Amino acid sequence: MSDKKTFEENLQELETIVSRLETGDVALEDAIAEFQKGMLISKELQRTLKEAEETLVKVMQADGTEVEMDT
């Protein structure tokens, strides 16, 4: 079983972090740690979206060759 979180799990965790930080009830040290964790999750989400976009841009023709579509 893989320990890698799904896109949806990462998004939920990022939303939770943002909510905690928005309350303002977090100690400064904890807020910095949460912010850093959120930034890492955000980068992972962006990477996943980029990979998905690259996959969707390719379309297989009937003969099996790939065609790049305009984005």
UniProtKB/Swiss-Prot annotation:
It comes from the Bacteria. The keyword Cytoplasm applies. It is found in: Cytoplasm. SUPFAM superfamilies: XseB-like (SSF116842). It holds the Pfam family Exonuc_VII_S. GO terms for molecular function: exodeoxyribonuclease VII activity. GO terms for biological process: DNA catabolic process. Keywords: Cytoplasm, Exonuclease, Hydrolase, Nuclease. The keyword Glycoprotein does not apply. It catalyses: Exonucleolytic cleavage in either 5'- to 3'- or 3'- to 5'-direction to yield nucleoside 5'-phosphates. Gene3D superfamilies: Exonuclease VII, small subunit. GO terms for cellular component: cytosol; exodeoxyribonuclease VII complex. Its EC number is 3.1.11.6. It is an enzyme of class 3 (hydrolase). Bidirectionally degrades single-stranded DNA into large acid-insoluble oligonucleotides, which are then degraded further into small acid-soluble oligonucleotides. Belongs to the XseB family. NCBIfam families: PRK00977.1-2, xseB. Heterooligomer composed of large and small subunits. This is Exodeoxyribonuclease 7 small subunit.
